[in-house]
Amino acid sequence: MRKITLIMFTLLICAAQQVKAQTDSMLIRPTVDKRVELLSIIFRLTGNPEYNRNDFKLYTDRIESHFSPYKNHELISFARSLVKTDGVSYDAVMSMAINLDNQFNLPADYGSLDSRWNRNQVGPFIKLLKKFVKDSRFDAFYHSNENLYQEAVSRFMPIYKSIDTQWYNDFYGQKSNDRFHIILSMSNGPGNYGPSVTDKENIHNVFSVMGAWVTDSVGMVVYPPELILPILIHEFNHSFINFDPEMFRTSGEQIYAAVGEQMARQALSLIHI
């Protein structure tokens, strides 16, 4: 009897560990992403207010020092025209970032890309982006800040370890097959974004791009849990509640008509609701 009990207990432990492994695999370890840093810098140089925060001054001063000579680069001029004519800003910028690969190529099928990106302008933008990367020595800048990036990730890890992805499954009564990513954005102040992309393996990848707006006595970014955790929970909730937005389009349009002005000030158009 003792032997049977021991076997059953061992099986229960193994099953629990398997469940934990499956849920933990939903949540990817936080990182600083060079695609996000590059696009943030580009739209800082265009003059977009939301990408011109200096809350993490230790880092943004380095950006200004390195990239100021390129404010009139042909890419920046082209990007300014996209801001003016198509409203490329806020989360549209981050949508482009996560759709790129690590060589800054855009896949042939980029259906997840935000609709504010004019499909006729995407090719020229990518071509100029690659030229900007080379001309501005972006890779050298990124590598020179790797210690800062690693320290930021280290400071974020306690929050990452406290996230219980199984809670979502239990609360909503359904399992999401999405993969959740946390990207630490170093220059965007309190700007936080939640873009998503479906990859070639048909896995839906949900991103929480977290800004940096609180620093310690020496100017290094910190991540107070009481500020950060609610934002993460909010962003990842979308994966469970945004299954069929068309069901609510009519009522959403009626509500938006009453509050549209206030929502627009928060960079939320009807499509974001």
Q: What spans do the regions from the language model cover?
A:
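Bacterial Sec-dependent N-terminal signal peptides
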Residues: M1-S25
